[in-house]
Amino acid sequence: MRTLVVDHPLVAHKLTVLRDKNTPSPVFRQLTEELVTLLAYEATRDVRTEPVTIETPVSTTIGTAFTKPTPLVVPILRAGLGMLEGMTKLVPTAEVGFLGMARDEETLDIITYAERLPENLTDRQIFVLDPMLATGGTLREAIKFLFKRGASDVTCICLLAAPEGLAKLEEELSDANVTIVLASIDEKLNEKSYIVPGLGDAGDRLYGIAG
């Protein structure tokens, strides 16, 4: 597993505004989209391509195109949906799948309540969208779900991570071909498993408080 924190003034500025509790939902959504596009630029640095021959108005030349199948983008519901537009603006030909995951309040296990993905993910290059890597439980189960379908190349784009959750992922996925791309690794988790300083509940700030 590899971790990449994107160090760029625009990333730092947009993240600062996202963190501000006074930032309203419409601005929060717009900034999330913009920030994801910046992170996706780095996350797609190793996207698979092949040479293609094209005709310009002047001559024939060799260009670059995505290999087939094209990248698969998988937002984790619901907060991951707020990141989708920022990703597909950069990679508009990508296919999009969905994973709905939540923690069972009684058992505390992560359950999959919805999915719309190809049955066979062998040879697919997959980009998972999940804004907050707190305990790491949801992202870990999402990656395992994809691996069970045959995936072997997964990149996760997150806005923030707590060191505790990141360490747990590294421990369990140390040998896996997984890359985590982040805007920031924050200080810690608090007693409620919120990232500190964090930005609060990303889903609530994107869409309101409906669960």
Curated annotation (Swiss-Prot):
Reaction(s) the record says it catalyses: UMP + diphosphate = 5-phospho-alpha-D-ribose 1-diphosphate + uracil
GO biological process: UMP salvage; uracil salvage
Residues at which uracil binds: 195, 200-202
Binding sites annotated in the UniProt record for 5-phospho-alpha-D-ribose 1-diphosphate: 78, 103, 130-138, 201
GO molecular function: GTP binding; magnesium ion binding; uracil phosphoribosyltransferase activity
Stored InterPro entries: PRibTrfase_dom (IPR000836), PRTase-like (IPR029057), Upp_B (IPR034332), UPRTase/APRTase (IPR050054), Ura_phspho_trans (IPR005765)
EC number(s) stated in the UniProt entry for this protein: 2.4.2.9
Classification via CDD domains: PRTases_typeI (cd06223)
Notes on activation and inhibition: Allosterically activated by GTP.
Top-level EC class as recorded in UniProt: transferase
Keywords: Allosteric enzyme, Glycosyltransferase, GTP-binding, Magnesium, Nucleotide-binding, Transferase
Pathway participation: Pyrimidine metabolism; UMP biosynthesis via salvage pathway; UMP from uracil: step 1/1
Named cofactor requirement(s): Mg(2+)
Entry's cofactor comment: Binds 1 Mg(2+) ion per subunit. The magnesium is bound as Mg-PRPP.
Similarity comment: Belongs to the UPRTase family.
Function: Catalyzes the conversion of uracil and 5-phospho-alpha-D-ribose 1-diphosphate (PRPP) to UMP and diphosphate.
PANTHER family from the UniProt entry: ADENINE PHOSPHORIBOSYLTRANSFERASE (PTHR32315), URACIL PHOSPHORIBOSYLTRANSFERASE, CHLOROPLASTIC (PTHR32315:SF4)
Listed name of the protein: Uracil phosphoribosyltransferase
Protein source organism: Arthrobacter sp. (strain FB24)
Native organism taxonomy: Bacteria, Bacillati, Actinomycetota, Actinomycetes, Micrococcales
